[in-house]
């Protein structure tokens, strides 16, 4: 049985059922699975299934306890067409994996649609109503809202930095008129939104369960690992991947897949002027700075100066490997 432990050494481990609805660990660390219990993922590239069934197979490979949650669920009901990613040629040696065919045109639909469905099912089991708290630089918020807006067991509060996301993303979030959806514009940066969310998640002041759908939640990683397994399935030789990176959740998912057998050589994180990730990979030191404005507002997801997800890869010095 896979157990989940904190990156900061908290001794108590939790189960898959607990990690579904988890935020931060009691010591404010991020949860990680005991990787020794996870099989090599490369053999899954031989599966010939629909993308949704393929993702279910990967979830079960990552944790067999997920089977009772994914087997009879529609993980991609929000997609108008197949959720299978699309590959387009850029030139003779480079392809683009298109992950913008979901309901919000964000790659985060691919992980949040399954997570929303699984979290709703788990809350129904418990007879509880949960509160999802999300900090967003634009894309997570709209994708999270779409994932849970029809939920019978979830309310969602989204924190976004005022005037620092694209107008398209703002309209996506604020035009959803549902009794369980709440949007709050924060006077500050995404890092400020993330700080507020982490403080609430680590010291819950409310008398109800608070859930994170940010990549703090391990199931987000599982959903993202799934499309890297699918991607390597399309090639006979190892590949390199280049990923626009802000909080490092997506790039970490590629690294996790590689560390569990996927044929990925280089993982290249691309940043803008907020280059804390570049400095981290160059020096091994994670040194947050003040967020600087960029000329690419549509890429607000990389306007981040205090990424928290590198903590998973730094755990135990694993970033060196």
Residue ranges and their predicted role:
Residues 290-298:
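Short beta-alpha connecting loops at secondary-structure transitions
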Residues 1-27, 292-293:
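Charged, compositionally biased N-terminal leader segments and the immediate start
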Residues 96-150:
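Well-ordered mid-protein domain cores that form the structural environment of catalytic cofactors
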Residues 105-107, 131-139, 187, 213-221, ...:
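Active-site nucleophile and cofactor-binding loops and adjacent substrate-binding regions
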Residues 195-199, 207-258, 262:
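Domain-scale recognition of functional cores that engage charged ligands
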Residues 142-184, 276-288:
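Active-site-proximal loop->helix
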Residues 302-321:
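Single conserved hydrophobic/aromatic residue that forms the stacking wall/gate
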Residues 26-105, 177-206:
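Small-residue-rich anion-binding loops in enzyme active sites
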